[in-house]
Design a protein with these regions (language model features):
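C-terminal catalytic histidine-bearing segment of alpha/beta-hydrolase fold enzymes
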Residues: 57-61, 67, 71, 75, ...
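Conserved serine/cysteine hydrolase catalytic core
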Residues: 49-55
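Alpha/beta-hydrolase-fold catalytic nucleophile elbow
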Residues: 18, 43-45, 61, 112
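Residue-level marker for beta-strand->alpha-helix junctions and adjacent short loops that shape enzyme
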Residues: 48-49, 65
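Hydrolases whose catalytic domains are alpha/beta-hydrolase-1, hotdog thioesterase
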Residues: 26-30
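Conserved G/P- and acidic residue-centered "switch" motifs that form tight phosphate/ATP-binding loops
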Residues: 23, 66
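A conserved short beta-strand
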Residues: 36-47
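Gly/Ser-rich "nucleophile elbow"/oxyanion-hole loop immediately N-terminal to the catalytic nucleophile
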Residues: 1-22, 32-37
Length: 134
């Protein structure tokens, strides 16, 4: 992370981690072990709240028909995160449910009816969420 930051001249306040499946699990690990290196995280088709790090912005993508990482396990992870970070539901727009905590840290959860495949239609919302944090 340090080498990439130096080589590509990135700064943590403008750097986000995103990963799908195992990569999504790695996003959760980065949240726990290197939270200072990222402004926010976007795990997709993953579970991982056991890595619980400090309060940070999250855009989570989960699919109800995922047979590799069952939706119930993904849901348990994000419900745990909602409770740990003291998030309150702020509304729903389409497939995205928005949350914020009393300090203004935000989380959005995109839920679709797909399988374990990456939900490409989640990308515009993810990009908009990250841009809103800059």
């Amino acid at each position: 992370i340090t080498k990439a930051g130096t080589e590509f001249k990135t700064v943590p306040s403008r750097t986000f981690a995103m990963g799908h499946s195992n990569g999504g699990g790695f996003c959760y690990a980065l949240w726990r072990f290197r939270p200072d290196a990222f402004a926010g995280f976007a795990p997709t088709a993953a579970k991982g709240s056991r890595y619980a790090g400090p309060v940070k912005p999250f855009y989570i993508v989960a699919s109800r028909n995922d047979t590799i990482v069952p939706y119930a396990e993904q849901e348990a992870s994000f419900k745990d995160m909602i409770a740990r970070m003291k998030m309150e539901e702020k509304g729903t727009k389409g497939r995205i449910t928005q949350y914020a905590n009393p300090d203004g840290v935000r989380m959005e959860i995109y839920i679709d009816g797909g399988t374990h495949a990456f939900a490409k239609d989640s990308v515009p919302g993810m990009v908009a969420f990250f841009r809103s944090l800059l």
